[in-house]
Swiss-Prot record:
The keyword Hydrolase applies. It comes from Novosphingobium aromaticivorans (strain ATCC 700278 / DSM 12444 / CCUG 56034 / CIP 105152 / NBRC 16084 / F199). Substrate binds at residues 19-28, 105, 132-133, 199, 237, 346. Pathway: Amino-acid degradation; L-arginine degradation via AST pathway; L-glutamate and succinate from L-arginine: step 2/5. The gene is astB. Its EC number is 3.5.3.23. Keywords: Arginine metabolism, Hydrolase. The keyword Hydrolase applies. This is N-succinylarginine dihydrolase.
Length: 421
């Protein structure tokens, strides 16, 4: 079978909560302390996966990581249920975080057509800027090495050293004539100095490119606009997304946009760059609606579709631009709203929830691939075992810890993934 793009969505974990742990993530901050609905959140995510399967796309799934994380707590001299003070409460909340559902941060992926050994390379992201995410990568690597165990087709690398912050595919884009053709890889980094941290370090991006053996002339290292980070674009995928020959971006996404566009066109002459001007959609509206945190996909018909959160369609300026684009000869021919409101309330849209891997599905462990029957199996597990709701004040409850642990165990049993238990 030829190489195709597979979107591996992270299933929203049973400990999904709104503890407000993510500095620079406006949605996370604004919903801190609210009651979350893990069961509804997971079902919404599965609804998006089913939606994309119905489009004729190849869909994968990653399981939630173990939470509350005893390794993380033990390293801090804490446990999951003891009484703690206010400062320690945030550390404990980090150990309960379900943030691994945003698999765009799981790894950076370079497919076989771009690499010298003809294998797909994946480097786990260290996510060191945020404590609640910094604990993820060892368990993420375990899952990646299971899903992509075929060493003839995949190479999975450990995270780069923690002194260089790496946020994975959320700050990486690939452009190409087609998914199975050689492409260019665009690494987007930030610079420090603003009110919010620049999570992606340039040296982390360059290290990943070296680990993957990418040809320097096929790589671009581009600075994210400081004003975008300051406005709440904590990852580049909040203000830009690419698919095959198309870059879809806000006017204020990059520090030097014209130089960025010129460098892309020099390396990929057929590139089509769709820029949304700030005079039509403000940076604030783009970030609030998550217009660009969308899945830009090549459909089986060959046309491109944009899977957006319903919040984007409900934002007048965004809807106006999308309707005008659909009426034009632009490359995006379908706009497909989906409901992932529970994830959105924590700062994660459709693009955050998936990791794109270009590969032959036959080379992937089939336990990580979905069809309608497997979606139904996972939905049944979620309905039976995921908590209906969690108040952040509940974090630390022994009963809740047992419920969360049991829910994940039931999922792994249903998917026959006992290696991850």
């Amino acid at each position: 079978m030829p190489l195709v793009e597979i979107n591996f969505d992270g299933l929203v974990g049973p400990s999904h909560n709104y503890a407000g742990l993510s500095l620079g993530n406006l949605a996370s901050a604004s919903n801190a302390g609210e009651v979350s609905y893990p069961r509804a959140a997971a079902l919404q995510g599965l609804g998006k996966m089913r939606h994309n399967l119905a489009l004729g796309l190849t869909q994968g799934l990653f399981a939630p990581l173990p939470r509350p994380n005893p390794v993380f707590l033990g390293a801090l001299g804490l446990n999951a249920i003891d009484e703690v003070d206010q400062a320690q409460r945030r550390l404990r909340a980090a150990a309960w975080s379900a943030s691994s559902m945003w698999t765009a941060n799981a790894a950076t992926v370079s497919p076989a057509p771009d690499t010298p050994d003809g294998r797909c390379h994946l480097t786990a992201a260290n996510l060191v800027t945020m404590p609640h995410r910094s604990q993820e990568w060892p368990d993420t690597v375990r899952q990646l090495r299971l899903a992509f165990a075929d060493a003839a087709h995949f190479a999975v690398h450990d995270a780069v050293p923690a002194c260089f912050g790496d946020e994975g595919a959320a700050n990486h884009m690939r452009m190409c004539k087609s998914h199975d053709a050689p492409g260019i890889e665009i690494f987007v980094y930030g610079t420090t100095g603003g009110a919010f941290p620049a999570r992606q370090h340039e040296q982390a991006s360059r290290a990943v490119a070296r680990l993957h053996g990418l040809a320097p002339e096929r790589c671009l290292f581009v600075e994210q606009a400081p004003e975008a980070i300051a406005a709440g674009a904590f990852h580049n995928d909040v203000v830009a997304v690419a698919n095959e020959r198309v870059l879809f971006t806000h006017e204020q996404a990059f520090a030097n946009p014209e130089a960025t566009y010129a460098a892309i066109r020099e390396r990929l002459p057929e590139a089509e760059i769709v820029v949304v001007p700030s005079s039509v959609v403000s940076l604030a509206d783009a970030i609030r609606s998550y217009l660009f945190n969308a899945q830009l996909l090549t459909l089986p018909s060959g046309e491109m579709g944009l899977v957006i959160p319903v919040e984007a369609w409900e934002t007048p300026s965004v809807r106006g631009w999308l309707e005008a684009h659909l009426a034009s000869n632009g490359p995006i021919r379908r706009v497909l709203p989906v409901d992932v409101r529970q994830s959105m309330a924590n700062g994660g849209g459709p693009a955050c929830l998936r990791l794109r891997v270009v590969a032959d599905p036959a080379t992937v462990d089939p336990r990580f691939l979905l069809d309608e029957a497997r979606v139904a199996i996972v939905e049944e597990v979620v309905r039976r075992h995921w908590p209906e709701q969690i108040d952040p004040a509940d974090l630390g409850s022994d009963i809740l810890a047992q419920t969360v642990h049991g829910a994940r165990g039931a999922l792994l049993a249903a998917l026959e993934l006992s290696e991850l238990a």
